[in-house]
Design a protein with these regions (language model features):
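Secondary-structure transition/capping motifs at alpha-helix termini
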Residues: 50-59, 84-92, 143-144, 167-177, ...
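Non-cysteine beta-strand/loop elements that form the S-adenosyl-L-methionine
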Residues: 92-111, 200-210
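Histidine/acidic-residue-rich catalytic or RNA/ligand-binding cores of hydrolases
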Residues: 41-44, 158-166, 193, 212-218
Length: 234
């Protein structure tokens, strides 16, 4: 589908519509949390073409996709690429020392990695990044002082991300590090306490609860887990 979905016409039109929606909503700053997900160079060029104009009344904080920028590069080479992106940032399109990493699979496709008892029908989730590779990436970016965001959807995905944070913090302690769990569909109370103790933040997708909890309670994970999607103290 990529040749159709990512055709120049559709890709450009999608960004133009995004621009209109953000403007209509009155937002002054938005984030692109996985720059390079489709095509790094193309995204940079097209994003600059659409948004680097006087009629763009908002800023975009751009966070690179960690697996993309590290692919076939040493970490030193990766840092050089990211430093160059930051140096060439503008008022509207801004790269900082931040990176987006990925733990387990998508929530809507039920590919989140779950702790026992897992899914009711017996299927298992998927890793977007093997745990040992994710830990390596976390440690490398942590040592270099980056703010790390990790896509996590299942409680096993959360566990792997927190273990990576704990190892990094034990080796090279940092304060106000900004390590953030993104989405966090399922998590245990103990994981929330551990995240707090490690200084992590959570950017939870609470829409999961409203959109999926009823159906997932019936078919996927049962009532107890479905009722605590996006576990927050509210």
């Amino acid at each position: 589908l990529n040749p159709y979905i990512l055709s120049d016409t559709r890709f450009t039109l999608g960004l133009e519509r995004l621009k209109q929606v953000v403007h209509a909503g009155g937002h002054t700053t938005i984030g692109d949390m996985a720059v390079g997900l489709f095509d790094f160079e193309r995204e940079l060029v097209t994003t600059a073409k659409i948004f680097e104009r006087a009629d763009t009344p908002f800023r975009i904080e751009q966070v690179p996709h960690g697996a993309v920028v590290t692919h076939n590069r040493s970490f030193e080479e990766t840092q050089a690429v990211l430093t160059d992106l930051s140096a060439n940032s503008s008022h509207r399109l801004n790269f900082r020392a931040r990176v987006k990493l990925f733990s387990d699979g998508a929530f809507f496709s039920q590919l989140a990695q779950l702790l026992p008892p897992g899914y009711l029908d017996g299927h298992v989730g998927e890793w977007l990044t093997a745990p040992e590779v994710l830990h390596e990436h976390i440690l490398n970016f942590w040592r270099a002082g980056y703010q790390i965001h990790v896509h996590v959807t299942g409680d096993m995905g959360v566990e792997v991300a927190l273990e990576g944070l704990a190892k990094a913090q034990a080796e090279h302690p940092r304060l106000l590090h900004g390590f953030t769990l993104e989405h966090m569909g399922y998590a245990t109370p103990e994981q929330i306490e551990r995240a707090k103790a490690l200084g992590a933040s959570v950017s939870a997708n609470i829409y999961y609860l409203h959109e999926l909890s009823g159906r997932y309670a019936e078919l996927s994970v049962g009532y107890e887990r479905a009722s605590t999607m996006g576990r927050l103290k509210t």
